[in-house]
Amino acid sequence: MSQDLNEQPSAGEVRAFAYRLLGRREYSVRELDQRIRRKWPRLESAAVEDLLDALVAENLLSDERFTESYVRTLMQKLQGPLKIRAALRARGVSDALISLELERHAGQWADLATGWLQRQHTGPLDFDGRGKFYRRLLNRGFSHDQAMDALDSL
């Protein structure tokens, strides 16, 4: 591996770096592009784009797989669809792909919000307590309706 930022890495070096990253977890195309450019800022754009295109063609890099994996991970952390959508946009995933994946889990959001709320609090809530948990649900990325449904289920 070249440590000098002025020295151009070989194509094999860049590909090996990409393989190591992809071996650990799924990446979006934009995320992997940013990681490569951060490591080698002077690397030619055409070389990076060619590598990314090749990885997509070989089905080693896929925004679809990344989106599925990322949504599943954040759902396990009891995050809501609004927060997940914002995180995926920040990682360069298309809005159409985000909407498609979130729609696949449409029936689960209310259950996630209710499950999170039941873990946080047991028993009846007074007005101030409802407001506190409502705000916390919104901060976790749940919509107004999902938060209200979760609060009403207690």
Language-model segment annotations:
Residues 1-154:
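An alpha-helical, amphipathic repeat domain used for nucleic-acid recognition
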